[in-house]
Design a protein with these regions (language model features):
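Bacterial N-terminal signal peptides
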Residues: 11-20
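Short, compositionally biased P/S/T/A/G/V-rich stretches that sit at domain boundaries
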Residues: 31-37, 147-197, 278-288
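Short amphipathic, basic-aromatic surface patches that mediate peripheral association
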Residues: 48-59, 190-205
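Short coil-to-beta strand junction motifs in C2/discoidin
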Residues: 59-66, 202-212
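Surface-exposed loop/edge segments in extracytoplasmic proteins
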Residues: 73-81, 218-227, 266-267
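Aromatic sugar-binding surface patches on proteins
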Residues: 88-113, 232-242
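Short acidic/polar inter-strand loop motif in beta-rich domains
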Residues: 120-140, 260-269
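Short, surface-exposed loop/turn segments at beta-strand-coil junctions that are enriched for proline
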Residues: 242-249
Length: 288
């Protein structure tokens, strides 16, 4: 009988272990109620900064830049406006080493375009910039396609759009000024980055790395190429030339100045047309 009693005791203990214990039960977690504002529009700030390649921000000195943000799916313009402000901190942008994640253009106040959009879902947009607006002949355009996510602001440096080129302007002779055949004339041109910074020897924008030259055209034909040299005046480069004969240029000539830096990808052209006269005209007499 002893073994039977032992077996019964073991069965009782086993049943107690396996029996459910209601007092120790863990209630199931309740799901949280849905967020009633989940589909509400969320204000999303986008900052766009237009800069000149290898240079500063396009600020008020060069007329700034126009920025347009367009919804890719619908083609609808979401925002448009002007970038205005200063060109930025030259020492920080051009001379100070920095890590990739460190702000470059926003360490000090600089020109930017800022807008806030009410977004309910992620959208893909084209952000386009055109400038410098004060120099239409040198104006460039650039576009970048990105995603915008509701509630995720793009600030600090923001979306940086880079324009390539130079502002090249013929300063002398003045565009449209009549030229006298066979006269010895000095061609002068100024060269600046698209942000308005001066291009000159030994500067942050070193003209020694840039091929700067002039051309004389009759019609579409180049009749002479001129190597231009720094004149010592701000952003000034010059080269002398002789005005062609009237019989060779009855419709006048075109003067062209070119700045080319293949290493950086920056190029700029300035040109103007001039009538050619066969002789000097006497000054007009003023009526008494």
């Amino acid at each position: 009988m002893k073994p039977v009693g032992t077996t019964l005791r073991l069965l009782v203990l086993l049943s107690l272990v396996l029996a459910p214990l209601p007092s120790l039960g863990i209630p199931a977690e309740e799901e949280p109620p849905p967020d009633p504002h989940l589909n509400d529009p969320k204000p999303t700030t986008i900052l766009v900064r237009v800069v000149a390649h290898g240079s500063m921000v396009l600020g008020k000195e060069v007329g700034g830049a126009r920025v347009t943000i367009t919804d890719v799916a619908s083609g609808r313009i979401l925002a448009t406006g002007l970038q205005q402000g200063e060109a930025g901190d030259q020492n920080q942008i051009m001379r100070t080493p920095h890590l990739m994640e460190e702000p470059l253009y926003s360490s000090r106040a600089s020109a930017a375009f800022t807008t806030t959009l009410e977004l309910t879902h992620p959208i893909q947009v084209d952000i386009e910039a055109e400038g410098p607006l004060a120099y239409p002949a040198s104006s460039q355009r650039v576009s970048k396609r990105i995603w915008l996510i509701p509630g995720h602001d793009l600030t600090n440096d923001g979306i940086v759009l880079t324009l390539y080129g130079y502002i090249v302007q013929i300063e002398h002779p003045k565009p449209g000024q009549p030229l006298i055949a066979k006269d010895d004339v000095m061609l002068r041109a100024s060269v600046r980055t698209l942000s308005g910074a001066l291009v000159r020897p030994h500067g942050d924008w070193d003209s020694r790395k840039v091929h700067i030259y002039g051309e004389i055209l009759i019609g579409d034909r180049i009749v002479e190429r001129l190597q231009m040299f720094y004149s010592g005046e701000k952003a000034g480069f010059e080269a002398p030339f002789f005005v062609p004969l009237l019989k060779d240029a009855p419709d006048g000539i075109t003067l062209r100045a070119v700045a080319a830096d293949p290493a950086s990808g920056n190029f700029g052209v300035g040109q103007a047309k001039y009538p050619v006269l066969s002789e000097r005209l006497p000054p007009r007499r003023r009526d008494p």
